[in-house]
């Protein structure tokens, strides 16, 4: 019979010290915590945790070894009006587990009870936590440490990026191992990508609603165990764990000079609303982990049924420890925080919130690239530009302005210029650098770039919600024909705008983020909310990729890295050498000219050498170039023996870059 000694309240989680396992679990309101140990046949042994230090329950299992399966049962009041939902009939996952065995199905035994506790035992249905102790030889791995001014982010899904790549062995496609394959790394290097941002790779589950429809949470934002690598993206090769496979991939990417940023989800948990499954925090200490209303209901500021209370001291430390685990154990270079406003809620948003203070005080984490999605759906949830120094932010105002300028004719050039200059009004006056603006035309959430030019309406019927899900405010333009089938004239206009938007993104000041597949002409058939589509709709079709567009994109990124005004990460000032704003006659734009309605022609001179010519109108125009000798530069022309230009004739919806001869 296994016996627990008192052990220690630290380190947190389940820790193997070479002689046994120390177990800890936080619960401020529990009356008893029971450690449940499972053998290979699923037989359960229950042992009361023998000690409590403050709010940490702990015990030590002499002789315990890695591979031990475990979970917890936590007893206490079931009093929803006070926020307590303890139910010892429910086996619970350790919030700090670093591995899980099994899957979470749509099983009624997970129900914890709404007004009364549900007495059905859930142990047989719940995945078991695994104690792991994996040493790893990083072979001198060092972070690429790409300066923000040179950073080009590529947002991708592990499976979507690699599942159909013909040069990756079939058994590795869709896995972490595929990220390490030379064919994939060559693509990233050829493009000029410096930083790969991965959609969640933490252990996530599929919502019961999706399971009933035969769908899955493809994006992975329904995270159950944020310390654990999701085994769904592992190849399953013998002797290679999911954690090792992810480490191998990150090491290979680092060897190629590519950073890795993980998309992390700390705004809500997979337990959803009161009708959702009781799997972890709800049963451990509901009142500490979640934002609750005065009557004990979940404050659903995320739209996902619950919101994690990150201002609670222990929950703050849980997040910090999790981030440090990924940084230390997997050498990740940064994090993108989903619905990041929740990070700063106290409950109102506060730049000095406990989690922000803890991040700033942690030397290791504050040196990482930290990116926030600066909104949630709660009161005061939109916080673009308001995150503390050290964060960069997804800039949806940039996205909408550039779409509106090129596709709708709704945005004047003054607004275009302000966002082209890293949305300076949002960030400069608040002591932030241009790199704080994460510029994007598209992201995983919404239309792809090609679909933005082919669909005026979303087409999300496959999601099973009768096309109600997904945004209706897309600022798209199908140029007169809904869908991918259109005549040559329409496709000519679409392709011109496709290149114009890519050029704008990659030559704007700030940090560009390219959605994987946009450089290939990937379409999701008009689905702008493909979160549940784990199929060819979201997987990149490498066989039909637009090779010319890929070359165009790579040339743009190379061009970007040559222009000091874009790479030095300093604000442009009036009269300096970084930028001059010119009209179609090559003259400096006057204050009055900036205010002239929706004028959509201008020239932008960068670093006194590179001239960006913009015609966002629906007709051809002629521009007179500023003084000097100008010639084309790839991808807009060939510099060898090029014709020297004094004027530029631009077709509708076009952008061009010229270089000044020395």
Swiss-Prot record:
One of its GO terms (molecular function) is hydrolase activity, hydrolyzing O-glycosyl compounds. It catalyses: Hydrolysis of (1->6)-alpha-D-glucosidic linkages to branches with degrees of polymerization of three or four glucose residues in limit dextrin. Signal peptide: none annotated. It is an enzyme of class 3 (hydrolase). It comes from the Bacteria. The active site is at 338 (nucleophile), 373 (proton donor). Keywords: Carbohydrate metabolism, Glycogen metabolism, Glycosidase, Hydrolase. Its EC number is 3.2.1.196. Pfam families: CBM_48 (PF02922), GlgX_C (PF18390). The record marks 445 as: Transition state stabilizer. GO terms for biological process: glycogen catabolic process. CDD domains: AmyAc_Glg_debranch, E_set_GDE_Isoamylase_N. Pathway: Glycan degradation; glycogen degradation. Removes maltotriose and maltotetraose chains that are attached by 1,6-alpha-linkage to the limit dextrin main chain, generating a debranched limit dextrin. Belongs to the glycosyl hydrolase 13 family. This is Glycogen debranching enzyme.
